[in-house]
Curated annotation (Swiss-Prot):
The lineage of its organism: Archaea, Methanobacteriati, Methanobacteriota, Methanomada group, Methanococci. GO terms for cellular component: cytoplasm; ribonuclease P complex. This is Ribonuclease P protein component 4. The gene is rnp4. It catalyses: Endonucleolytic cleavage of RNA, removing 5'-extranucleotides from tRNA precursor. Its cofactor is Zn(2+).
Length: 128
């Protein structure tokens, strides 16, 4: 009974987090940055209280340093860099915090293609 109740509570918490974050997005688009920040704060508190992971789609839209909702193009700058390793750089224009998100999927695809090419070349040389 306890596990069932826990699952139900966590599901409700995820729903509330999603609602609060969508409200924060709407308020940020209107220009009410303080209200958006408050909604983000409440959503994070719910996640901490219920000890659940914050959804990834929303986690990247929050500045970890100042807690503002990041609207790309307005209060956040997004750049794609390929130095050292391919990654996306998100800069909060409120506090200047920088977040790097590696583009792992693209790197894995590149490795897979190279491996396939090597295998094809190897099989062609053996058949000749």
């Amino acid at each position: 009974m306890k596990k069932f109740l826990e699952k139900k509570l966590k599901k409700i918490a995820y729903e509330r987090i999603d609602i609060l974050m969508s409200l924060a997005e709407e308020e940020a688009k209107k220009g009410n940055w303080d209200r958006a920040k408050r909604y983000v704060y409440l959503a994070r508190r719910i996640a901490m209280k219920m000890r659940i992971r914050f959804p990834k789609k929303w986690k990247r839209r929050i500045c970890k340093k100042c807690g503002t909702f990041l609207l790309y193009g307005r209060n956040a700058r997004v750049r794609i860099k390929s130095k050292r390793y391919p990654h996306v750089v998100i800069t909060c224009l409120e506090c200047g915090a920088i977040y790097r998100i590696p583009m792992i999927r693209e790197k894995k695809e590149k490795r897979r293609k190279k491996l396939e090419e090597r295998l094809k070349a190897k099989s062609n040389s053996q058949t000749s």
